């Protein structure tokens, strides 16, 4: 877990670094391209076939839009207005959005008192960490709003993936490629 935390935390620093030489759209495109090439290479090496069928490709396009394209673009644009630290802190709200949208998108997820209390505590904790009452010192509110929109994309995309793709028989690397 520590390794993942370090890697995910540094992503926002590297986005800020990339923005010194590239526009936000170029940073987002580069991230998507690098990820896609890596996954296609893994699929080729493991001789994994790509999925077939129109419906699965539509679902994959929606997932790519929600979990890659939009958040990458929103975070890159946001970091032209807020610090990489603030962007990373906003990203920590992702589990809150996943829980909230998961309850809406996946009908088998039942709303329980524990989930609602967890959501409320998480939201209040995020406000404390972010110093919501003093946002003026943290950067441009539009940059923060872009970060929130990016985490909301993750929050919608993850339960959508669970609902539409998890049950499929194709290997995960095939679906991700």
Map each language-model feature to its residues.
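Glycine-/small-residue-enriched transmembrane alpha-helix faces in small-molecule transporters
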Residues: 1-29, 77, 137-163
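Membrane-interface interhelical linkers
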Residues: 1-3, 36-63, 76, 80-81, ...
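Hydrophobic residues within alpha-helical transmembrane segments
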Residues: 3, 29-34, 62, 66, ...
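Specific transmembrane alpha-helical segments of multi-pass solute transporters/efflux pumps
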Residues: 7-15, 40-91, 124-129
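Specific alpha-helical transmembrane segments that line the substrate/conduction pathway
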Residues: 26-37, 67, 72-110, 150
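Hydrophobic transmembrane alpha-helices of multi-pass small-molecule transport proteins
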Residues: 39, 61, 93, 100-101, ...
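Transmembrane alpha-helical segments that form core, pore/gating elements
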Residues: 39, 98-100, 122, 136-177
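Structural signature of transmembrane alpha-helix termini at the membrane-water interface
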Residues: 41-48, 73, 100, 104, ...
């Amino acid at each position: 877990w520590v390794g993942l935390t370090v890697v995910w935390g540094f992503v926002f620093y590297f986005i800020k670094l990339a923005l010194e030489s590239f526009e936000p759209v170029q940073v987002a495109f580069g991230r998507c391209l690098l990820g896609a090439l890596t996954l296609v290479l893994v699929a080729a090496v493991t001789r994994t076939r790509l999925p077939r069928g129109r419906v699965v490709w539509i679902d994959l396009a929606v997932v790519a839009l929600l979990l890659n394209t939009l958040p990458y673009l929103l975070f890159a644009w946001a970091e032209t207005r807020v610090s990489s630290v603030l962007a990373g802190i906003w990203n920590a709200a992702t589990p809150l959005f996943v829980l909230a949208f998961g309850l809406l998108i996946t009908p088998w997820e039942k709303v329980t008192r524990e989930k609602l209390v967890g959501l409320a505590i998480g939201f209040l904790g995020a406000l404390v960490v972010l110093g919501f009452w003093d946002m003026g010192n943290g950067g441009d509110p539009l940059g923060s709003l872009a970060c929130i929109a990016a985490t909301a994309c993750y929050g919608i995309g993850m339960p959508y993936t669970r609902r539409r793709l998890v049950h499929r028989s194709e290997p995960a690397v095939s679906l991700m490629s």
